[in-house]
Amino acid sequence: MVNVPKTRKTYCSNKCKKHTMHKVSQYKKGKERLSSLGRRRYDMKQKGFGGQTKPVFKKKAKTTKKIVLKLECTKCKKKRFQTMKRCKTFEMGADKKKKGGAVY
């Protein structure tokens, strides 16, 4: 399980050129465009009779995805992405575990 704080002091390579506070959030994939060429080509191919025209991928190998963090500088608002290792569970800004604390 990975717990990441909501703010982090790290280097800003834009105008700041120094370590500043960054707002941390998890990267999410955007909405797919219906007008992109590949999508239009696929939709045209799927039209009419003949069923599924391209193979549907079934040999999934990975059980987890790599976590991608979006870091935004609080001073200049520059955004950058940082990849982390693979993990099953991911938390943002949860309370830190204390040594010798009660386990429920």
UniProtKB/Swiss-Prot annotation:
Keywords in alphabetical order: Cytoplasm, Ribonucleoprotein, Ribosomal protein
InterPro entries: Ribosomal_eL44 (IPR000552), Ribosomal_LSU_eL42 (IPR053708), Ribosomal_zn-bd (IPR011332)
Primary subcellular site in the record, as a coarse category: cytoplasm
Pfam families membership: Ribosomal_L44
Single annotated GO MF: structural constituent of ribosome
Cell location: Cytoplasm
Superkingdom, natural source: Eukaryota
Cellular component terms (Gene Ontology): cytosolic large ribosomal subunit
Biological process annotations from GO: translation
Subunit structure: Component of the large ribosomal subunit. Mature ribosomes consist of a small (40S) and a large (60S) subunit. The 40S subunit contains about 32 different proteins and 1 molecule of RNA (18S). The 60S subunit contains about 42 different proteins and 3 molecules of RNA (28S, 5.8S and 5S).
Cited function: Component of the ribosome, a large ribonucleoprotein complex responsible for the synthesis of proteins in the cell. The small ribosomal subunit (SSU) binds messenger RNAs (mRNAs) and translates the encoded message by selecting cognate aminoacyl-transfer RNA (tRNA) molecules. The large subunit (LSU) contains the ribosomal catalytic site termed the peptidyl transferase center (PTC), which catalyzes the formation of peptide bonds, thereby polymerizing the amino acids delivered by tRNAs into a polypeptide chain.
Family, per entry: Belongs to the eukaryotic ribosomal protein eL42 family.
Protein name: Large ribosomal subunit protein eL42
Source species of the chain: Plasmodium falciparum (isolate 3D7)
